[in-house]
């Protein structure tokens, strides 16, 4: 049992246009009928482009640039692209994808990210993309890796090669949401390994995840890639939590 949502084989063989007729869609936020996951009015209201933020950690920063924290204590990653702020009602979509296996949300998350990338002038695309890996036990329990579900359509949209197994989680860490902020760095320290060092040496690696909270998980993964010779690491996350969280 994977927890994936799937259509009967007879429906999966139909063109997308036919499926839209047979399976009319409703907005995931307001419930009104629409052709996509989220209707245009809800997207404009709840998923408008983020205000100016730090180019490195994606925390709000009037005027943009790099925040004092990233200047004084540079994280291992070099840049972060975040499509939306993590808050109501979009936070419920993140939870539905992760814990209710509502996988059709993932391509919409990816499209929001791709739109954000397109709007960010001067952003260098990575040479390859990989998702933040789950531990084996959590992957078996959940049946899928939500970061990979977002990374697949994002890689296709950006025209960047996807390497799903570029890194692996070697330690079954406690979920960061269940750990105090002061303990989060220690919780993920040494949790990752690179499976193919030659593939990342001297290259720009893009890391995909659903949410960035403290940044410790992404920082540890970026540090792991840098130890194996990655030249640059950019995070691509659907949602960024406010600094106070």
Predicted segments, located by residue:
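Glycine-rich phosphate/pyrophosphate-handling loop used in enzymes and phosphotransfer proteins
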Residues: 1-245
């Amino acid at each position: 049992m994977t927890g994936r949502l799937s259509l009967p084989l007879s429906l999966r063989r139909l063109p997308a246009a036919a499926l839209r007729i047979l399976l009319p869609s409703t907005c995931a936020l307001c419930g009104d009928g629409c052709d996509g996951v989220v209707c245009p009015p809800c997207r404009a209201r709840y998923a408008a482009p983020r205000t100016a933020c730090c180019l490195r950690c994606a925390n709000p920063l009037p005027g943009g640039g790099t925040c004092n924290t990233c200047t004084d204590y540079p994280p291992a990653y070099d840049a972060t692209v975040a499509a939306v702020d993590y808050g109501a009602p979009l936070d419920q979509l993140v939870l539905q994808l992760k814990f209710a296996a509502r996988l059709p949300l993932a391509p919409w998350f990816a499209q929001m990210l791709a739109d954000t990338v397109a709007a960010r002038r001067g952003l260098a695309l990575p040479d390859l993309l990989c998702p933040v890996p789950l531990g084996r036990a959590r992957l078996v329990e959940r049946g899928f890796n939500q970061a990979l579900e977002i990374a697949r359509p994002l890689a296709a949209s950006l025209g960047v090669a996807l390497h799903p197994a570029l890194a692996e989680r070697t330690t079954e860490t406690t979920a960061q949401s269940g750990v105090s902020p002061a303990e989060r760095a220690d919780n993920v320290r040494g949790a990752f390994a690179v499976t193919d060092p030659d593939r990342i040496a001297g290259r720009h690696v893009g890391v995909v995840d659903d949410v960035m909270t403290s940044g410790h998980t992404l920082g540890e993964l970026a540090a792991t890639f840098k130890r194996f010779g990655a030249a640059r690491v950019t995070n691509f996350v659907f949602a960024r939590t406010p600094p106070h969280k």
